[in-house]
Swiss-Prot record:
Family designation: Belongs to the gamma-glutamyl phosphate reductase family.
Name of the featured protein: Gamma-glutamyl phosphate reductase
This protein's record includes keyword Cytoplasm: yes
Subcellular location(s) per record: Cytoplasm
Designated gene of the protein: proA
Organismal lineage: Bacteria, Pseudomonadati, Pseudomonadota, Betaproteobacteria, Burkholderiales
Keywords: Amino-acid biosynthesis, Cytoplasm, NADP, Oxidoreductase, Proline biosynthesis
Enzyme Commission number(s) from the entry: 1.2.1.41
Keyword Oxidoreductase appears in the UniProt entry: yes
Organism this protein belongs to: Cupriavidus pinatubonensis (strain JMP 134 / LMG 1197) (Cupriavidus necator (strain JMP 134))
């Protein structure tokens, strides 16, 4: 595809999405739910066909030398197909945020002012090897009254196209425009460059992918983005922590899963409790094969307790998202140093304190500048499902618009509505 052809193709996709977004904005809840349930039924009906198509993507990935983890993300197993269908049904069961009016108040002039929740419009979603994102993203955008342009990874092009056909079938069956969900059908990377600059058609970009993808989009995008670059999450064990809670929470925050962006990467411990808190916790970490990168004070304390195999932490370790069985540990003087460290080195994603001191906990959640701040809870809870959002399209550590897990409400905005009885301004 030449550059001219690609630009013409992307412009056509953009125009169709913009037109469809107007129809979606006025679509009834019943029609949107009907579409979601029809798509779920179609996925179950065509499960064998989807697996056959997906097998071709998987075969190409293996032939191209992709590793087992990549192939696993790409594969549409029976479980993955079942989860996609169930996810659609769960989103259909969620309350529809569109049209909700809130904050109504009467003004002295006689007018009544409120805010109505409305769709964002056209959402561009860029993602990599997971074909299930095609359905997750389409479902959330559909339920929130948006149109979406989906640009998945080239490695999943056949799977994504097959899933998009089922989405179009569901939309049409409910009387909604099939163009409300479009998958970019070219694997040309220039399509991403055009998508992120189509300000005339696209209202927001949501990237779902690795750090290199996000960094590129941050440099090149002209369309606003909902994104997070890193998940450098902390837990601070305060001097007034309950040790059982500290061990349980910190073990879970690091070792339940290593790859998610809400996994703890740095553990901070008050010097007043380090000698009691760290040995039992670090014993668990070492038994699970976690490499411990420690500050000098932590090394001295742990070696005195009989630990070996420790690695010195360097300045860059405090800024790393390992996504691996590696944990940086720093002993700090107390709350002030912990807050300062998190705000300096963290990624404003999710941070937690373990403490039984109410005032300390409240100061921590006030002063730590992150999208999610917790008391006596694992950072792994930073998730749309766990927050009761039903589902999420991603997590944002930006400060404008959506912050934290982005569910249906995060794909909407508020407009002011005014009710009057012929009032005029004097």
């Amino acid at each position: 595809m030449t550059e001219l052809d690609l630009n013409q193709y992307m412009d056509r996709v953009g125009r169709q999405a913009r037109a469809a977004s107007r129809a979606m904005a006025r679509a009834s809840t019943a029609d949107k739910n009907r579409a979601l349930l029809t798509i779920a039924a179609a996925i179950r009906r065509d499960a064998d066909k989807l697996k056959a198509v997906n097998a071709r993507d998987v075969e190409r990935a293996r032939a191209n030398g992709q590793d087992a983890a990549f192939v696993d993300r790409l594969t549409l197993s029976d479980k993955a197909i079942k989860t996609m269908a169930e996810g659609l049904e769960q989103i259909a069961a969620l309350a529809d945020p569109i049209g909700e009016i809130s904050n109504m108040k009467f003004r002295p002039t006689g007018i009544q002012v409120g805010q109505m929740r409305v769709p964002l419009g056209v959402i561009g979603i860029i993602y990599e090897s997971r074909p299930n994102v095609t359905i997750d993203a389409a479902a959330l955008c559909l339920k929130s009254g948006n149109a979406t342009i989906l640009r998945g990874g080239s490695e999943a092009i056949e799977s994504n196209t097959a899933l998009a056909a089922l989405v179009a079938e569901g939309l049409a069956s409910a009387g909604l425009p099939p163009e409300a969900v479009q998958v970019v059908e070219t694997t040309d990377r220039a399509a991403v460059g055009r998508l992120i600059t189509m300000t005339e058609y696209v209202d927001v970009i949501v990237p779902r992918g690795g750090k290199s993808l996000i960094a590129r989009l941050m440099e090149e995008a002209r369309v606003p983005m909902i994104k997070h670059l890193d998940g450098i999450c902390h837990v601070f064990i305060d001097a007034d922590a309950d040790l059982d809670k500290a061990v349980r929470v910190c073990d879970n925050a690091k070792t339940q899963r290593y790859a998610p962006c809400n996994t703890m990467e740095t553990l901070l411990v008050s010097q007043d409790i380090a000698a009691r808190a760290l040995p039992p916790l670090c014993r668990i970490y070492q038994e699970k094969g976690v490499e411990l990168r420690v500050c000098p004070a932590t090394r001295a304390m742990l070696e005195a307790a009989g630990f070996s195999g420790l690695v010195d932490a360097h300045e860059e370790d405090w800024r790393l998202e390992y996504l691996a069985p590696i944990l940086a540990i720093k002993t700090v003087a107390g709350l002030d140093e912990a807050i300062a460290h998190i705000n300096e080195y963290g990624s404003h994603h999710t941070d937690s304190i373990i403490t039984e001191n109410y005032s300390t906990g409240m100061r921590f959640i006030r002063e730590v500048d992150s999208a999610s701040v917790m008391i006596n809870a694992s950072t792994r809870f930073a998730d749309g499902f766990e927050y009761g959002l039903g589902a999420e399209i991603g997590i944002s550590n930006d400060k404008l618009h959506a912050r934290g897990p982005v569910g249906l409400e995060g794909l909407t905005s508020l407009k002011y509505v005014v009710f009057g009885h012929g009032e005029i301004r004097t």
